[in-house]
Amino acid sequence: MPPPFAHRITKYDPADRDERGHYHGAEVTVSDHGPVEAAYLEAIAAFAQESGIDRLEIREPAVTGFVTFGLEAPVDGHGLAGLFPADLAGYYDGAEVSVPVALELVRAMLRDQGAWCRLEQQDRFTVHVGWDQYVYVGSDQPCAAAVARTRELGLFAEPITMSPYAADLEEPEVTQAADEEFWERVRAELAVPQMLLLEESYLYNATRWHRLTEHNLDTVRAVLGPRALLSVWPDLNPDVDAVLAALPEDETVDFVWEAPNGTISHVTVDETHHQQLATSVAGARAACSLSLALDERHPLFHAALPDSDGVLRARW
């Protein structure tokens, strides 16, 4: 359940909204990277302090994808440089961060730098950053002092029923846990014998690929990211030229290949990049292409990693 008290924090005066709540005043929908942005962060900190919150959990973390809708250009590192290592270890679903780190994540989201996540503390406190510099804060406390402080900062904290980004409004698409039964299914497929391709989505828009065998399955399992979404595909095709020749002319696909050194890489391409792709994958051992269209993207099976207690808490 979402927290019982929710506020929409904005720089937009409610007096400029019509009877349906639509805003008709001057609207600057990007961060000023300055005093207004700082006011947002101070307001959120005030709500957290009044709610007794000193740590928040990262939920459904994402990075820049193939298509971006942000109003500002994404930056290298997705706005996470200095907060997490280059490999983004520590930025995963369920990771706990201090309020100061959470505020830096909010800053990156306000700036459309690429990263996005929900910030939550169970049903006690939530922070969600939406479009056009709208921030939604939920708390189990009414936070009257924080509301007043927000107004002092030149912003507006409007009471609302619920954040439009509340997780309760969305049904998870994946409800199967990657438990021992799942891994036995994988092991049975490998025993045919054959190899399989494992897609590990460790963040939204971030994947790693593993070529599975009976012998390396346990090794791969040991390095998978917390709460990752796992999709099992048929093995790569050793006839790379045939895979390249079969690329669709009017569709964007994920192209996955194994380099001569055994490294598995992938890139999202459309027809304008086919010639360049052929050069990039010269010498590849094997490859495949996977459609991005959901109605054409059918792995053999997929599931999400549960926590160490066996409970599936990931939301995919």
Feature names for model-found ranges:
Residues 1-134, 138-316:
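Structured alpha/beta or helical-core interaction and ligand-binding surfaces enriched in interleaved
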